[in-house]
UniProtKB/Swiss-Prot annotation:
Tagged with keyword tRNA-binding: yes
Pfam name, any one: Pept_tRNA_hydro
InterPro entries to which the protein is assigned, alphabetical: Pept_tRNA_hydro, Pept_tRNA_hydro_CS, Pept_tRNA_hydro_sf
Record site: Discriminates between blocked and unblocked aminoacyl-tRNA: N10
A GO molecular-function descriptor: peptidyl-tRNA hydrolase activity
Organism lineage string: Bacteria, Pseudomonadati, Aquificota, Aquificia, Aquificales
Family note: Belongs to the PTH family.
Record's protein name: Peptidyl-tRNA hydrolase
Chain's role: Hydrolyzes ribosome-free peptidyl-tRNAs (with 1 or more amino acids incorporated), which drop off the ribosome during protein synthesis, or as a result of ribosome stalling. Catalyzes the release of premature peptidyl moieties from peptidyl-tRNA molecules trapped in stalled 50S ribosomal subunits, and thus maintains levels of free tRNAs and 50S ribosomes.
Taxonomic source organism: Hydrogenobaculum sp. (strain Y04AAS1)
Quaternary structure note: Monomer.
Cellular compartments annotated: Cytoplasm
Domain of life: Bacteria
Gene: pth
Amino acid sequence: MIKALVGLGNPGPKYKDTKHNIGFKVIDEVAFKLHLKNPLEKYMSIVFHIKEQDIYLIKPQTFMNNSGIALRQFVEKTKIAPSDILVIYDDMDLPIGTIKMKPNGGSGGHNGVESIIRELRTQEFPRLRIGIGRPASKEEVTNYVLSPFEYKDTPIVKKTIEKASEYAIRSLEEPLEYVMTLCNTKSS
């Protein structure tokens, strides 16, 4: 079972509703569902800690491309293995509304995941990938991920965040392989 959920995103109101911050949105939804309040600021992150179960919800505050720095600090202090940390992030290779889990792997071109791989010196950490779709041209990637979802996509995005938060919570309570099978066989 997972011991920490890490949602990737960028800090500050400017980025709050961007596609790149969907990992933060999932963490916020998990915290809401678990009735968690008053997060701490530590490990260069916003952190919710469920002491009874020793579970963490983390939103690195280092900006996306340096997420690994915050996560390395967390791992060094808590001694939680990377394989027990579920990283939640946006994925342009998946259509909007799609959710997929995988046990490990490369960065897939995601700078936040690349930073984590570099800082933790391993690819052996599970991921919960949330589809945000792809822009029409490669030149638009930065603007695309740093812009909000289109209004027409709002209902599906809300439903996706809700569903992703359910998988994240289940990963804290049930074997990851089981949750992964559920996630990857559902039509998300």
